[in-house]
Each structure stands twice: as C-alpha cells, then as structure tokens.
C-alpha cells in the first residue's frame, strides 16, 4: 500500500507541475503562447480559460472535495495533452514530448488514485 501511495503522489505531483507550468505560461507569457496557438491553428481566446481550468483542475484533484469534479479534472487533463500531442504531430514541430509526459503522468495518477483511495461510485442524481 505504501508503494502505491508513493507512486500516486509522485505521478500526481509531476502531473500537477506540468499543468501548473502550462497555466502559468498561459497567464504570464500570453504573447509567446498566442504565437504557439496561432502556429498550431487554435484560437487565442482559449488561452485564459484553459489556464484557469488547469488551475481549478489541480485544486479538484488535490483536494478531493468532489468526486465528480475530480473525475472531470482527470478527463480534462487527459484530453488536453492528447489534443496537444495530435496538434504538435500534425504541425511536425517536434514539441510533443511534454504532451506525452502529461498523458503518462495523468494516467498513472488516475490509476493509482483508484488503488490508493479506492474505486468508488458516486450517485450524480439524488436518490429517494
């Protein structure tokens, strides 16, 4: 159990670091990031909402206050780098390694979250 917990926290820490770095780049280096977005063919209005959602996702995963929000954050943390990976491969700019690492850390974190904290089911609608 202790080994699983260590793996979980390392993977979650690395996943959080990647997405926090990405969000900080989006917020503090807007001009540079907007150039990347234009090069990849994405609209630049996505930059600030993505940064905010990445930060909120990290909070949802680390606090575990809502199982639904945590699962939603994990889904977003998987979709974002998958789409980034595809975009980088299509453009052939060679900048795809961070996306691959984010995918690996996200899957590892999600898998070991289930092992350490239990596989749970949540009722999304109130039951009577």
Q: Which sequence ranges carry the predicted segments?
A:
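Membrane interface segments of multi-pass transport proteins and intramembrane proteases
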Residues: 2, 39-42
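Core segments of alpha-helical transmembrane spans in multipass integral membrane proteins
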Residues: 17, 21-24, 42-62, 76
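Extended, low-polarity transmembrane helix blocks
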Residues: 1-22, 62-128
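Short, surface-exposed linear patches
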Residues: 41-42, 48-49, 82, 106-107
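Membrane-interface helix termini and inter-helical loops of multi-pass transporters
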Residues: 30-40
């Amino acid at each position: 159990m202790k080994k699983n917990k260590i793996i979980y926290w390392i993977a979650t820490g690395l996943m959080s670091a990647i997405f926090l770095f990405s969000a900080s780049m989006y917020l503090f280096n807007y001009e540079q990031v907007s150039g990347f977005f234009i090069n990849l063919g994405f609209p630049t209005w996505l930059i600030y909402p993505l940064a905010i959602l990445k930060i909120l996702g990290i909070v949802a995963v680390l606090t575990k206050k809502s199982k639904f929000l945590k699962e939603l954050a994990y889904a977003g943390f998987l979709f974002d780098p998958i789409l980034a990976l595809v975009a980088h491969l299509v453009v052939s700019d060679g900048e795809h390694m961070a996306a691959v690492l984010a995918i690996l850390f996200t899957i590892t974190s999600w898998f070991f979250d289930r092992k350490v904290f239990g596989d749970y089911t949540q009722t999304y609608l109130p039951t009577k």
